[in-house]
């Protein structure tokens, strides 16, 4: 399986894992252990999965603070799937600079289409676009000039 496919699979699993952590308060070690026992992890970028699973809670205030200014409601009023997608994507915007912002947005939109409520992907797209403009300003500007 190609590296991009492994990353996509990790992101799909991360939305589910971050949802479990957010809604159920499940311990991260237990979440990671369940995913390893229930899935064929040879088809997953396990490093990405691990780093983001533990990185989101560790940096939660900064991550939530990245996208909250662009919300039209309180963060706690978001559906938990959209919140998981925004946290995952904001983490990547902040900490995985090697992933182009357009890829981060596209992956977030696709995750929202797959797991989120109807039309959540439009909301996710708008928020992540604003996050990219703020957090990846040089990359966005260079892309717009090209």
Task: Outline where the language-model segments fall.
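N-terminal interaction/assembly modules
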Residues: 1-114, 118-146
């Amino acid at each position: 399986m190609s590296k991009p496919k492994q990353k996509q699979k990790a992101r799909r699993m991360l939305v589910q894992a971050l949802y479990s952590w957010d809604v159920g308060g499940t311990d991260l070690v237990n979440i990671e252990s369940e995913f390893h026992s229930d899935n064929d992890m040879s088809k997953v970028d396990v490093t990405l999965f691990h780093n983001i699973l533990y990185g989101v809670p560790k940096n939660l205030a900064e991550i939530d603070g990245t996208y909250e200014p662009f919300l039209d409601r309180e963060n706690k009023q978001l559906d938990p799937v959209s919140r998981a997608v925004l946290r995952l994507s904001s983490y990547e915007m902040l900490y995985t600079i090697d992933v182009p912002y357009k890829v981060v947005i596209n992956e977030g939109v696709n995750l929202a289409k797959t797991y989120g409520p109807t039309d959540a992907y439009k909301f996710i797209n708008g928020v992540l676009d604003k996050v990219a403009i703020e957090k990846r300003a040089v990359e966005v500007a260079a892309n717009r000039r090209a």
